[in-house]
């Protein structure tokens, strides 16, 4: 099945900026995160979204993808590789090896005994709203493959060692020679008996079964920076799986899921909340206490405040994860209309309305009421 276009997965155009790509990724990753979305295909969609973002957020990978798509430009035609054949017998034609190298990728066979970096690992961590805002230090356990302590990674039983493969004589390749009218062609393929290593294990280590690696749970101490947000990830260098043949270890990527808060909402480094006001507080003004992540602060409400009015508490938001100060807290007031009134309260409100006279019918509200009256009277 053909892979979907990365731009299509994130729902952005091919000219999208890095900020637009990041915004689309954050929105979709929240929607399809397996901890939130319980649909059967949510995990697969989340994986697809993450893969698309990892490519499009990296300038080099994105340029490569824009040029070649999902195809590997080194693959050549139908998996044919020039290194599978020896064109030494074409000396009279001059440069045949270079010609085939040009057309079919020209890659040399990778040495299976060469050092290779270990695999990267991913770990998903759930944080509370406050933990994400202020950061924390914690220990986590991750399952990973590690070098076998019994054989020290050789795969051979202690006291024994790997032996030279008798089928390929240590070359890691098996060659078949074919004569043609144009000369001699030697076909080389990876030795199926030793897997191209040129060696085989006669007596395997009983602990790892000859693989040289065992499954373990590794405890890692992690320092989570203050200001981390939902969907962001933290790279812990060198804590992935160990390298092969002396290669460097991979990295550990911790992806964070932040639980929603019952009172606050977050947008970047800013925090939003709603505060209820009584009719009297809004009309007469008041000084109220507002909860923030940093404790309660006093907020002065001016007389005549309307529902939906927004106040800003500077520096009371979330610390920037890169250390660039703090965001702000935005307080939106909502004037609460009472629904259950006693007879005395109703009478007082009627008296208040009568005492108000024409005050509600002056200014912009007055023009609105005049239009309503004219509409009911049929005036234009």
From Swiss-Prot:
Zn(2+) 1 binds at residues 148, 151, 205, 208. Residues 5-69 form the J domain. SUPFAM superfamilies: Chaperone J-domain, DnaJ/Hsp40 cysteine-rich domain, HSP40/DnaJ peptide-binding domain. It is found in: Cytoplasm. The keyword Cytoplasm applies. NCBIfam families: DnaJ_bact (TIGR02349), PRK10767.1 (NF008035), PRK14276.1 (NF010869), PRK14280.1 (NF010873). Homodimer. The J domain is necessary and sufficient to stimulate DnaK ATPase activity. Zinc center 1 plays an important role in the autonomous, DnaK-independent chaperone activity of DnaJ. Zinc center 2 is essential for interaction with DnaK and for DnaJ activity. This is Chaperone protein DnaJ. The lineage of its organism: Bacteria, Bacillati, Bacillota, Bacilli, Bacillales. The gene is dnaJ.
